A protein has these predicted regions:
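C-terminal catalytic "cap/lid" subdomain
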Residues: 1-164
Length: 164
């Protein structure tokens, strides 16, 4: 459950970054979290989208035993998203863990089938299978790079595209 709350804190941080540039933001969660977030519903999210508000989905599914990766894939499917943008601690998808293998090779592009077959640790297996079944592509990029969110939004990113 700490992981669920950590995603709420991360969304608050990123939301404030966006707000400081004048953008409207909202954070939706599957559970009540004080006055900082609102309870997720597809209708509420769509109202925010129609209003030009950037919506952050935090808290995973709200249930233990499901990763926050699974939660975000679920929300993307529910919202008929075009793709999922994942800001991670590493800057893309690698053939092995770059933290333990300095020779790890980064993919510029890889299919979700390959991710599943090679058991690459981009997102957990449940979330990967959901992406495959619902044809949901991913864009994986490093959050630690300067301007990474803006660069990714503008199509200039140093990450990996996961195709379906």
């Amino acid at each position: 459950q700490i992981g669920m709350l950590a995603t709420v804190m991360n969304c608050i941080y990123v939301s404030e970054m966006f707000r400081s540039t004048g953008m409207k933001t909202a954070i939706l969660t599957p559970f009540m979290c004080g006055s900082v977030t609102e309870l997720f519903s597809k209708d509420l999210a769509n109202r925010y989208f129609e209003d030009g508000t950037v919506v952050f989905f935090a808290g995973g599914t709200g249930h233990p035993y499901f990763s926050t990766d699974t939660g975000i894939v679920l929300r993307a499917i529910e919202m008929d998203a075009d793709a999922i943008y994942l800001a991670k601690a590493i800057d893309g998808v690698y053939d092995s863990d770059p933290k333990t293998n300095p020779a790890a090779k980064k993919y510029d592009e890889i299919s979700i089938d390959e991710v599943i077959n090679k058991k690459l640790a981009v997102i957990d297996m449940t979330a990967s299978v959901m992406c495959m079944e619902h044809k949901m592509p991913l864009v994986v990029f490093g959050l630690n790079e300067k301007e990474s969110i803006v660069n990714t939004y503008n199509g200039n990113f140093n990450g990996t595209r996961v195709t379906v």
